[in-house]
Amino acid sequence: VAMMLWRSGPMGDLKLIYTPTAIIIAQVVISFPVVTGLTAAALQALDPRLKLQLYGLGASRLQMIWMLWKEARLPLLAALMAGFGSVISEVGASMMVGGNIRHQTRVLTTAIVLETGKGNFDIAIALGILLLTITFLVNWALTWIQQRGAQR
């Protein structure tokens, strides 16, 4: 991703390197294979008779896609959680394409690395606790949604 966004790279004319947009692009590239693989597995695990049943009931293509996604919602939430986990803990790509520029492209993970390198372990630990808290709350909310959906 970094080589594509560098000034001499194929997307260099867009001047995206060291911007928040570059960080977003890098995070999408990192999480895409995880989310795509788990989503494909979730959809393939559906009972093949469900598609035939929906056809038999006269469902349109859009209605069928909606029902299949709805039926696979719990594994899809697991895919979302896995993608979030890979993105929230990532440091390298954010540092390379974002540059860790104060007030512009510094994110929690790169700030933790910076503060640890400067010897400010108290700040690094506080940022780490904040990152863990955010991660815990997001995963708790998604797990709650999954469990609520499983009861239906």
Located regions from the model:
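Faces of alpha-helical transmembrane segments in polytopic inner-membrane proteins
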Residues: 16-40, 70-75, 82-89, 135
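Non-cytoplasmic
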Residues: 3, 76-114
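Helix-boundary and loop/linker segments of multi-pass membrane transporters
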Residues: 9-16, 68-71, 117
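Membrane-interfacial helix termini and adjacent extracytoplasmic/periplasmic loops
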Residues: 1-28, 98-101
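Residues that define the loop-to-transmembrane-helix transition and helix capping
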Residues: 17-21, 51, 62, 73, ...
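Membrane-interfacial segments
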Residues: 5-13, 46-47, 89, 101, ...
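C-terminal transmembrane helix and the adjacent membrane-cytosol boundary/short C-terminal tail
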Residues: 33, 37-51, 55-58, 62, ...
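Interhelical loop and adjacent transmembrane-helix boundary motif
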Residues: 11, 96-145
